[in-house]
Amino acid sequence: MRRDIADLFELDPRLTHLNHGAFGAVPRAVREAQDRARSAVERAPMRAFRDELPAALEAARAAAAAFVGVPADTAALVRNVSEGVAVVLSSLEVGPGDEVVVSSHGYPTAAYAVQSRGATATTATFGLGDDPHDVVDAVARAVTDRTRLVIIDHITSPTALVLPVAEVAAAVTPVPVLVDAAHVPGALPGLVVEALGVDFWVGNLHKWSYTPRSAAVLWVAPHHRDRVRPLVTSWSHGLPFPASFDLQGTVDHSAWLAVPDGLAAWHALGGWQQVERNAELLRRGAEHVRTALGTPSPRAGIPTAPCLEVVALPPGVAETPEGAASLWQRLYAAGFVVPPVSFAGRGLLRLAAAPYNDEDDYERLADGLPALLGAGSSAP
């Protein structure tokens, strides 16, 4: 790791951290800002909640909106993408008899949220080697007269693809589209949310934007704002979107209050120049791993995320969830924080690049992988 950058975080130096995209990493300075926000509440709870919190939350919300390039009155703070998905499903009153289209590359909890409401999650299937038009066609074919919503990932979690969300939205009109943008804020340059033609867009801030966990931003198109309400009804009841999301009972708001500090850390670490540096590092690192495993480079098709990439594992490795879990345990025991993924009967290794990584991290992984895979050759 780049020791000078790693020291800004609290990461265990005994581990090689190559999975920043999963839960992010909070810089020490941001955690300290969150601690100060908590302490301010403890010193004078009544004043903090009644007098100071509303304006502070409005400022944090405005900072988050500006970071993803949307006006302050168009985006609410939520705790994570899962909450944002639940908010949209509830606000649209999705229920039994309804269908919601998800994709075979989508994060599973979106389908679970659909099913929890008694609706059917219909899967649009496309392959790792397909082209963007195959994604659009697959989603459009999955839409029926009972489809109430399409949920499509902007960057797919298991496969690190950047999906053509604008083209999907155009193809399925007038069906509303919710974009799961969990991996997007701070990681995908050139983003113009309002130009995508989608209805809802929700992205985590803790993954690539260095905020504390439990901070995400939910953007809603104008024609839906009157009907979108938080899952908890409390003191913000009756306020227009997005202020209606600010006060949902007595909860710990410190993650939201530290959002401006996390975004400041993103800029201080290099902003988009750092993302470009990480992307180039990841391409070289992934090639080191592919060379060590003797697996091919991916076919050019759907674009891949700047700071996430998957490497194909040899046949027979991590092809099932059980096999992937077994390999994960061996990797972690050897000091590597990198997730194997079982996807459509294939074993993949998802790599990430963050400011604290250097090329040595990937070279160490490449050197250690063959023996680790051999040690688990009899695993499921």
Where are these regions (language model features)?
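Conserved beta-loop-alpha segment that forms the PLP phosphate-binding cup at the N-terminus of a helix
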Residues: 51-65, 69-97, 108-111
